[in-house]
Amino acid sequence: MPSRRSALRWMAAGSGLAALTPKSSSAAPASPLKHGKIKQSIVHWCFERGSKWKVEDTIKAAKELGCVSVEGLAPQHWDLLKANDLKCAYVGAHGFVKGMNQPAFWDANLKVIEERINQCAEYGNPNVLSFTGFADTTAQGGGVVSLEQGKKNCIEAYKKIIGHAEKKGVVLLLEHLNTRDSAEMKGHPGYQGDNIDYCAEIVRGVDSPNMKLLFDIYHVQIMHGDILRRLESCKDIIGHIHTAGNPGRCEIGADQEINYPPAMRKLLEIGYTGYVGHEFIPTKDPMVGLREAVTLCDVA
């Protein structure tokens, strides 16, 4: 449990938040949520990048829209989240280049993963994010690893830490990313885990209820499509969901190709109870895009 000192920090953090408002002229006061069957979350980095939002802006938006989490925030921001009754649905550990597919990076990665697991357990946050890494990290002090060896290495590495995650009641997530889009942060050419079935094999190979798949609908659409059947095929191992519009990792809506309401209904059908994080880079007023996303994903 957090210490008394942490509790005092939560109170101090919360007292200043009411004076902050998201940097948007279109924010309406009423939450768009009606059904609330999907636990919706906002991924902060997108709005920091696209709209120059501060953490306080994203928290304010989450509260206004009825979201229950602001995710991807480092632990130093968790007191502020706690003060506003919000979770951090996932926290990052190591990066997506130097991942778990190469033993050269195991020591550093496992150290920070263990630290994040402990922090999540203390604050009651559910997930720590991890990556396969790039196939070729020669320039980063690693080497070149084949698909098969990369899979074996990932499974071996995760088995070194998964017992600690189980003990602490925290889930370790593996994220699938697309390699087709070369635009910065819209795709990740060189990433080894660009096949959803490959990532699913790693997760299942670890064979733990605390090892799950981060199913990013945007990335899966670019690499594979067939979203609804892929959600079905992964239903036993999905631990987190991300959204964004395609093409362009833009807002969710009528101007892009992914139809999100059926995907959300599919999640309810397969019994998914985790978070759905909105991870699009805004191209217009961010509150307009977020409000639309929250409304589209608020299915009955």
Locations of regions flagged by a protein language model:
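Short acidic, glycine/proline-enriched helix-loop-strand junctions
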Residues: 79-91
